[in-house]
From Swiss-Prot:
Gene Ontology cellular-component terms listed: cytosol
UniProt name for this protein: Polyamine aminopropyltransferase
Similarity comment: family membership: Belongs to the spermidine/spermine synthase family.
Species per Swiss-Prot/TrEMBL record: Pectobacterium carotovorum subsp. carotovorum (strain PC1)
Role description: Catalyzes the irreversible transfer of a propylamine group from the amino donor S-adenosylmethioninamine (decarboxy-AdoMet) to putrescine (1,4-diaminobutane) to yield spermidine.
Catalytic reaction(s) noted: S-adenosyl 3-(methylsulfanyl)propylamine + putrescine = S-methyl-5'-thioadenosine + spermidine + H(+)
High-level lineage: Bacteria, Pseudomonadati, Pseudomonadota, Gammaproteobacteria, Enterobacterales
Gene that encodes the chain: speE
Alphabetized PROSITE patterns for the sequence: PABS_1, PABS_2
Disulfide-linked positions: none
Source organism, top-level taxon: Bacteria
SUPFAM superfamilies listed in its UniProt record: S-adenosyl-L-methionine-dependent methyltransferases
Alphabetized GO MF terms: spermidine synthase activity
Sequence positions that bind spermidine: 64, 88, 158-161
Gene Ontology biological process: spermidine biosynthetic process
Positions contributing to S-methyl-5'-thioadenosine binding: 33, 108, 140-141, 165
């Protein structure tokens, strides 16, 4: 029996995780980053950019459901949604399940990611790239929100970690542009890393977002691939009530949507805003 190739993630210098590689489906350096898609017995197809795992078939639903349904159901009447990043198509798939949404714009810096993922991760997008409400823009996210004249009800930043091309999506320029592009009553959410290991990222985002939004917080979910504990998602709006929607209202909205989820429930939604004390203390000490 031949020994399987081992792929090591390089996100952290002193510790990490590895994956056995059953088969490499694609590996190439695009114009912006090094992209690999391979098969793993336990997690299915795995995509990594610049040595960091972005998504796996086995657990992607947790990430995509939480980053989509929490803001959309909190808003309650989102018509226009902007996705920054999200080239694997999972976020688009979940947003497109909301039939009340009339227009979905996705801004992806790397056209290669979209092409490769449509071919090698078809279950992520599940045909949503063909949704007539969808518009794909190949551009840098910061540049787009700086120049865009359109307004959106929900903005989802499905960004990579703040290294390489994803670094700009954690800057004040980006957050300011997103605030400018939101309609009144709009909500901004973003991937913000595993807070036990990447606490500085959460503190930095909280500080920067606070300059442009009246209500800034985080919510969380545990996603096995993103090891180290709970992953945090940044939340920003100018209406604190949107973060405190009652369970009855959420249940009604969720039932009316007709959406069936594998992770998200209205109760999970409410509980996700309960944060561990170590993060609350770090945010408080940074003020």
């Amino acid at each position: 029996m031949s020994q399987k190739e081992i792929w090591y993630e390089t996100l952290h210098a002193n510790f990490g995780q590895y994956f056995s590689v059953d088969r490499v489906l694609y590996h190439e350096k695009t114009d912006h980053q090094d992209l690999i898609i391979f098969e793993n017995d336990a997690l299915g197809r795995v995509m990594a950019l610049d040595g960091v795992v972005q998504t796996t078939e086995r657990d992607e639903f947790i990430y995509h459901e939480m980053l989509t349904h929490v803001p959309l159901l909190s808003h309650g009447n989102a018509k226009r949604v902007l996705i920054i990043g999200g080239g694997d198509g999972g976020m688009l798939r979940e947003v497109s399940r909301h039939h009340g949404v009339e227009h979905i714009t996705m801004v992806e810096i790397d056209a290669g990611v979209v092409e490769f993922c449509r071919q090698y991760l078809p279950n992520h997008s599940a045909g949503s790239y063909d949704d007539p409400r969808f518009n794909l823009v190949i551009d840098d996210g910061v540049n787009f929100v700086r120049q865009c004249s359109d307004k959106f009800d929900v903005i989802i930043s499905d960004c990579t970690d703040p290294i390489g091309p994803g670094e700009s999506l954690f800057t004040s320029d980006f957050y300011q542009g997103c605030a400018r592009c939101l309609n009144e009553g709009g909500i901004f959410v973003a991937q913000n890393g595993v807070c036990f290991l990447q606490q500085d990222e959460a503190v930095g985002s909280h500080k920067k977002l606070g300059h442009y939004f009246k209500d800034v917080s985080f919510y969380q979910a545990a996603i096995p691939t993103y090891y180290g504990g709970i992953m945090t998602f940044a939340w920003a709006s100018n209406n604190p009530a949107l973060r405190q929607i009652d369970a009855t209202t959420l249940r009604q909205r969720f039932a009316q949507s007709g959406i069936t989820c594998r992770y998200y429930t209205p109760d999970v939604h409410i509980g996700s805003f309960a944060l561990p004390q170590y993060l609350l203390s770090a945010l408080q000490n940074a003020q």
